[in-house]
Amino acid sequence: MTKVAAHRGATRPAHGRRTRPPPPLVAWPRRLLLALALAVAAPAAAGEPPAPIRLRVAGGLADLGQYTRREHPFWTQQVPEITGGRVQAEIAPFDRSGIRGQEMLQLIRLGVVPFGNVLLSLAASNDPELNGIDLPILNPDVATLRRTAAAWRPHLTALLRERYGVELLAMYTYPAQVIFCRQPFSGLSDLAGRRVRTSSIGQSELITGLDGIPVVIPFADTANALRSGVVECAITAAMSGNAVGLHEAASHLSRLAISWGVSVFAANRAAWKALPDDARTRIAEGLRRLEGEIWWDAELETENGIACNAGLDTCAGGRRGRMAVVESHAGDEARRARLLEEVVLPSWVRRCGSGCAETWNRYVAPAIGVRARER
C-alpha cells in the first residue's frame, strides 16, 4: 500500500499565502483501511506478461446517475479497455463503503483511499476554502457554474496539491438544487418567514439572510416534512425531489439554482505517480471525457427534473406533476446579486479567513463581476 507522510505544520501555496494545515484524521477501523487501500499486483514470473495493476476507487453517491451511468462503467469497463488490460479497477460508492464524505479528502491524502470522489460541500466542513466554487446562489444556471469552475480550478488544483498532496484529475457536478414550496411564491423575497429545508451551512445562512427559518432535514425525510407542514419549502435537486414525491407535496418550484453539488475526482499523488506513464496518460484522457459527460448529464437532468415536476411532454424517466415553475425575473436577479455580496460571500469569508477574500477576488471576481470584502 502506498504510504504518504502526514503534513507537518502550515504549508504555503503557490500564491504565497500561509494556510491552515489539513485537519487531523479520525481513527478508522483497520479492516476498512486495508479494504480500501491500493491493491498492488504481485510481480510476474520471468517470461510472463506483467500482472495487471488493480485499483480500488471510491466513487460518488450510490443510486444517482453520475455513479450508476458514468463512474461505475468507466472504471470497471473503460479503464481496462483503454489501458489494454494493464489496469483493472474496482469501484464502490463512498456512502456504501463506510466512509463519511467529510473524511474522504483526508483518506486520499494519507493514501488509504488512493482514488476517490470528494464532494466539496462535505469536505468544506473541515476546510471552507474548498467549496468557494459552489456557494449558494453563486451559480444560478449551468453556464455561470461553468465559468466559475473554470476560474476556480487552477487555485483548487494548487490547493489540493500543496495542502493535501492530492492530484485533481477531474471535476464533476450533480444537477442543480432548486426550491420546492407548498404555497405559491414569486421569488427569493417570498421565502421570508417560511420554514425551509436545507442541507448545508451555506444554504442555512442564505435562508436566514432572507428572513426565513432554515431547518436541516435528511433528504429521505423531506417529502414527509413537506406534507406534514414541518417545513413549507425545501431545497433539493429537481429530479431527486420528483423521485421521492415532492411534486405531490408541493405546488411551486423555482428554476433558479440554489446550489449544485460540485465534486472533484482526486488521487493520492504518490499512488498516481506510481502508475506507469502510459496508463496515467490514458486514464487522464478518459477522465477528461468522463467529466464532459457528467456535466452534460447534470444540465440535462436539471431541465428534465423541472419538466417532469411541471408535467411537460418532454419529461423522461420521472413522474409527471402539475407544479408551477417560478421563472427568474429582473427583481429576483437584483436580490440574488445583493444577497451574494452582502450575505453569502461575507459568511463564507468569516468561516474561511480573510485570505480567502483575496483569493476569491483574484480568481473568481473577474469571471462573475462580484468581489468579496475582506474582514
Name what the model sees in each region:
Residues 140-157:
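A gly/proline- and charged-residue-enriched helix-loop-helix capping module
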Residues 47-143, 162-163, 167-375:
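N-terminal secretory/targeting leader peptides
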Residues 26, 30, 75-76, 156, ...:
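Hydrophobic alpha-helical context, especially transmembrane and signal-peptide helices
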Residues 1-27:
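N-terminal secretory signal peptides that target proteins for export/translocation
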Residues 41-47:
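A short, compositionally biased domain-edge/stem linker segment
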Residues 29-41:
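Bacterial N-terminal signal peptides
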Residues 29, 65-66, 151, 155:
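Secondary-structure junction/capping motif
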